[in-house]
Structure formats: structure tokens, C-alpha cells
Regions:
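Conserved ABC transporter NBD signature motif
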Residues: 60-67, 79-80
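Conserved ABC ATPase "signature" region
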Residues: 113-145, 152, 193-196
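Helix-to-loop junction immediately C-terminal to a conserved catalytic motif
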Residues: 52
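The feature captures the beta-strand-to-loop junction immediately N-terminal to the Walker
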Residues: 34-39
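Helical segment within the ABC ATPase nucleotide-binding domain
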Residues: 188-201
Length: 254
């Protein structure tokens, strides 16, 4: 083991005869902004799913802050400080913006909030949960929309809310799966500014197809193709790697 906040060792995921993730070794350091790129079908989202517990790997190990979490369910990984946003917006559309954030905040105050009916009590009975919720709403600039249903928000604001939901769990590491997908250039800039602002003190692992954006924000980049690590290094090193250029320009697909 190293001092990495996240480490995968030989992580492999097979679906029948298809190997979607193939012996991936990955180490994300504390405070690092790491990006994972690769052609469509390279195994990026499957890798995220194995790290977050949405899928169990066929082989290999996932370590988080020195603990083997390979077999832990997703909610236990969240409690340990691992957060994730999804490629497709993942909010409770019928609930108010405040309630979306509050439900996430409850996960880090769970010992204070005992009982099966906790989520239905008045928010003022939660003490720290209510204060934490309001703080998150302020940080993501959605306090003025707190009592609106999430489904009424503009798309960019729904993505902003999703980042707030992740932030509310107070994660040490955040996995961001194409957080700017479907956005205009202006929305993309605003979303990345928000991420770099409110998540600046966390370790970040990003999947993103906008290569210019990746080159701008990343400390290091890992390139996947056919489920394997093709290259890893600084943005300058990746930009100058012939194998990486061939993988993209050569149209490698699965």
C-alpha cells in the first residue's frame, strides 16, 4: 500500500467473454485532480462503478484511505468519504432542492438522526443537519431555489444541485462522471468553476470527453483503451504521447 487516498490493484471486470476493465492499477493522491480519458467503450464508467460499489469487480482490490473496500456496498463507501456524481443527472426531481441536499447531509449525521422516520421530521429538529444543508445551498448558489422542486431547475442548475448533494456528504474523494455532459460552453465553465471552488480541498477523479478541459484542470491523467491503462502522466506528457494520439485519431472502439 502507498499513501494514496484511493488505490486499485489489478482491478478487473468481466461481463461474460467481454473484459470491460482489465487489470487496472490506479493511485490517486490526497488533494490530486486526476482525470481518466479514453475512447468510447474504453471502460471508464465501468471502472468508476467498481470503485464506488455499483459493480463488484471480477478480480482485484479497491483500497480507500488504507482500507480494503472491495466488497463494501455503495452506501458504506459514501459513509467512509467516497462521493460520486453521475453522467446522467441523479436528483430527486419531485423533492425540493433543500430536501435533496438534506437527505445527503443526513448520511454524515446519521448517529444523531435515529429512527426509521428520520427523513420525514421537521428540518429544525435536525440541528447540525439543517445548518450543514443551508451552508451547502449557499456554496452552490442555490439558496434562492431551496424550496423549489428539483425537476423545475434548469439543466445546469440540476447539475449544480448534484454537486451539492455530493458535497453534503463531506467526501474525501469525489468521482465525477462527465459532469459537463450536454452543457453549453458557458454552463461548462460555470460548472467547472463551481467544482474547483467547492471541491478544491478534496481529491477528485474525473471522466470527461472535453480534452481541452481535462488538460486545463488535471494534475495527472490516466488513459484507458480496451479496459487497460494505455498511459499515465502529466497533461504535457499525455499530450505528447504517440500511443494516446493513435488511440483517439485511430478510432479505437469496442
Amino acid at each position: 500500500m502507498t499513501d494514496a487516498v484511493l488505490e486499485t490493484d489489478g482491478l478487473t471486470k468481466r461481463f461474460g467473454e467481454l473484459t470491460a476493465v482489465d487489470r487496472v492499477d490506479l493511485a490517486v493522491e490526497a488533494g490530486e485532480f486526476r482525470s481518466v480519458i479514453g475512447p468510447n467503450g474504453a471502460g471508464k464508467t465501468t471502472l468508476f462503478n467498481c470503485i464506488t460499489g455499483a459493480l463488484l469487480p471480477t478480480e482485484g482490490t479497491v483500497w480507500f484511505r488504507g482500507e480494503d473496500i472491495t466488497a463494501l456496498p455503495s452506501h458504506e463507501r459514501v459513509r467512509r468519504g467516497l462521493g460520486r456524481s453521475f453522467q446522467i443527472t441523479n436528483v430527486f426531481g419531485g423533492l425540493a432542492v433543500r430536501e435533496n441536499v438534506r437527505l445527503a447531509a443526513q448520511s454524515i449525521f446519521r448517529e444523531e438522526i435515529a429512527g426509521r422516520d428520520a427523513m420525514f421530521r421537521d428540518k429544525n429538529s435536525f440541528g447540525d443537519v439543517a445548518a450543514h444543508t443551508d451552508e451547502v445551498l449557499d456554496r452552490i448558489d442555490l439558496a434562492s431555489h431551496a424550496d423549489e422542486r428539483a425537476e423545475t431547475l434548469a439543466y445546469g442548475d440540476q447539475r449544480r444541485l448534484e454537486i451539492g448533494i455530493v458535497l453534503a456528504t463531506d467526501p474525501d474523494l469525489v468521482l465525477l462522471d462527465e459532469p459537463t455532459a450536454g452543457m453549453s460552453s458557458e454552463e461548462t465553465r460555470a460548472t467547472m468553476d463551481l467544482i474547483e471552488d467547492v471541491l478544491a480541498d478534496r481529491s477528485l477523479l474525473l471522466i470527461e470527453h472535453d480534452i481541452d478541459l481535462v488538460m486545463r484542470v488535471s494534475d495527472r491523467i490516466t488513459v484507458l483503451t480496451r479496459g487497460e491503462v494505455l498511459a499515465e502522466g502529466s497533461p504535457d506528457a499525455i499530450a505528447g504521447d504517440d500511443d494516446v494520439r493513435d488511440a483517439y485519431l485511430g478510432g479505437v472502439r469496442q
